[in-house]
């Protein structure tokens, strides 16, 4: 029978993830994913209202409500794209490494979800900075403030985000420790992930 853990103790096990990750169940995965989706949705709605107040886009109350709902849904779904991207990348890596584990997919999904939290924190930070400073659609935690006349440069700078990089390296660490890999792999995989994202931004 799978052992269940209190959701508030999840991060306490980040330094000893092997036994913890291998003991997780579907309920714990959902309990961790749910607040991330809710938090992301709230951040998206707040950011939407901050931007809307500045440019006065609303023409009616109904339009405002519909727009808010759409933004909230998109905000809730957005983390899934990153988490599934993490999952697919590391699942392919695990296939190449021939990693054998009864809970391989579940473990990768779980550590992918944990690793998204720095990005969620960045969303909160950007909302706060947008409130107290001039609104910046692309956020304050990346390099988009640099003005360089080069195609797709804004998209590239958006990927060079300190919290996205922290997220990538956190996942690399959790992956290598959970599956007993070499320490150097905790650097190789995150760097590869960041480079791939930059290359995709160039397309």
Predicted regions and their residues:
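Membrane-interface helix-boundary motifs at transmembrane edges
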Residues: 20-30, 98-105, 176-185
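Hydrophobic alpha-helical transmembrane segments
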Residues: 33-34, 72, 76, 186-191
């Amino acid at each position: 029978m799978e052992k269940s853990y209190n959701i508030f103790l999840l991060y306490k096990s980040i330094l000893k993830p092997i036994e913890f990750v291998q003991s997780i169940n579907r309920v714990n995965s959902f309990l961790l994913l749910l607040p991330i989706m809710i938090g992301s949705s709230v951040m998206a709605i707040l950011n939407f209202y901050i931007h809307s107040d500045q440019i006065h886009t609303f023409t009616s109350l109904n339009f405002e409500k519909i727009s808010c709902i759409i933004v909230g849904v998109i905000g809730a779904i957005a983390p899934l794209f990153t988490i599934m991207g993490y999952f697919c990348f590391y699942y392919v890596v695990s296939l190449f490494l021939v990693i054998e584990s009864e809970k391989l997919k579940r473990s990768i999904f779980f550590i992918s979800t944990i690793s998204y939290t720095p990005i969620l924190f960045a969303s909160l930070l950007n909302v706060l900075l947008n409130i107290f400073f001039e609104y910046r659609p692309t956020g304050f935690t990346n390099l988009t403030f640099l003005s360089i006349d080069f195609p797709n440069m804004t998209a590239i700078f958006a990927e060079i985000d300190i919290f996205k990089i922290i997220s990538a390296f956190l996942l690399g660490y959790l992956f290598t420790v959970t599956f007993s890999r070499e320490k150097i792999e905790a650097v190789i995989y995150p760097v590869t992930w960041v480079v791939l994202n930059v290359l995709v931004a160039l397309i």
